Curated annotation (Swiss-Prot):
SUPFAM superfamilies given in the database record: Insulin-like
Protein's UniProt name: Insulin
This protein's record includes keyword Nucleotide-binding: no
Short name of one Pfam family: Insulin
Subunit structure: Heterodimer of a B chain and an A chain linked by two disulfide bonds.
Any single Gene Ontology cellular-component annotation: extracellular space
Source species: Alligator mississippiensis
Keywords, comma-separated and alphabetical: Carbohydrate metabolism, Disulfide bond, Glucose metabolism, Hormone, Secreted
Superkingdom, taxonomy of origin: Eukaryota
GO biological process: glucose metabolic process
Amino acid sequence: AANQRLCGSHLVDALYLVCGERGFFYSPKGGIVEQCCHNTCSLYQLENYCN
């Protein structure tokens, strides 16, 4: 999958998709917004935020 910019609700939706029942840890201060919204991130990187 190509890297993509994901912001706000799009980012949360992507986390739900990637993490599924595991759930995820969403903290704007955790670097995910900087990584995925200000820059681009891959689904592989998103998985790092799953529980």
